[in-house]
Amino acid sequence: MNASPWNETLTEADLARLRECERHVGYRFRDPNLLAQALTHSSIKTEENPSNERLEFLGDSVLGLVMTEFLYNYFQDRDEGDLTQIKSVVVSTAALAHESDRLGLSGFYNVGKGVTRRRNLPVSLQANVFEAVVAAIYRDGGLELARRFILRNLYHHVLEVVENQHQRNFKSLLQQHAQKELNVTPTYRVVSEKGPDHLKHFEVVAVLGKKVYKSGIGRSKKEAEQSAA
């Protein structure tokens, strides 16, 4: 793995703080600079000390690969629609933020003065730092160690979704989360309809405020809205 540009800027105090964070994460970094970058918000990045945005980008893909492969192998009797629905909940912003908070990552996250820091970090930032830590572990120790970290922290979300799937209303869950954390009510927009009348497939996106999220597909508008949620 390539060394990060942080090597000469970490102080003894920085290293002590990172080692404490490692205990929360349950992983010892060979290169603690990767963890330092994962914990740095763009509001305080410098040329020498980059933010975690690139790691977050990588972590999102690593997380998606690991969870997709796990669900594919674990639930061999489930179709693509079921697997997609399970995955959408397990790797949702709410789930990642929950795990980030449980691990105490917000206490180690470096943010600038302009970033709102209420009692806890905003949910989106908590989820982002979880993804960045996933990428840092992947860069430091490879895919298998990243896989262990992901499944150790998210496996119970898989069980929760499966055990309660027949009772879950994804639109209701999204609405509760959006109203509580973002003070907005989700809306849904049909972006495409395909197929003959007896085999229609609808593609719907969820909209929260001004942000449009990934689409969901279903055989009815309601099913597509549930998938999008």
Task: Please place each PLM-identified region on the residue numbering.
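Double-stranded RNA-binding/processing signature
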Residues: 1-229
